Amino acid sequence: MLLQSPGDRAKTVIENDRVAVWDVSDPATALSFDAVVVSLSGGAAFLSKGATPSTAGRSMVINLKDHPSGPIANTTGYPLAFPRPGSRKILENEKVIVWDYTWSPGVATPMHFHDKDVVVVYLDDGELRSTSLDGNVVTNPFKFGMVTFNRGNRTHTETLVRGKQRAIITELK
């Protein structure tokens, strides 16, 4: 099935084999796939294929393509990325688990393993430093409304080194 266009008032921000993410400000057309709608005010909802998103303000529509990959076996000995201290599960079904998480300044998350691909919608302006098992350090600035897609099979810690940061994180099953 082809992905229906987001329309004139929406912008495609990510497109790959797993998802198509639309940045929308107005109600969109009926969905061609199941989707998670993440409001930039911090809420999230699951919508079934054929539904029409009802958005109040700016939202990200995460269209879930028919390409499940399933979780990757965790052989690292480290805990899974979620749940983690301070995280709150918003919803879970057979396709996704959606988490609300706020980083604390200067406090590293426990070293963890991502067994699933994730879509992250950032709700504040801040810089996160990621440190991998081999000691590789990468610092990335994330702004309000940014969206990223990260493949699973990663082990690292994260530390908020500047600003504030909260995100709605959608794990893809």
For each predicted feature, which ranges?
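N-terminal low-complexity, Pro/Thr/Ser-rich intrinsically disordered segments
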Residues: 1-17, 75-82
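Extracellular ectodomain segments of secreted/surface proteins
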Residues: 17-30
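Glycine- and acidic-residue-biased ligand/ion/polar-headgroup-sensing regions
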Residues: 27-49, 114-134
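Ligand-binding loop in jelly-roll beta-barrel domains
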Residues: 28-35, 43-44, 49-67, 151-173
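Tight coil/turn sites that cap or link beta-strands
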Residues: 49-50, 103-106, 144-145, 153
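Surface-exposed beta-loop interaction hotspot
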Residues: 55-98
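Conserved small-residue-rich
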Residues: 84-134
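Structured core of small recognition/catalytic domains
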Residues: 112-113, 117-162, 172
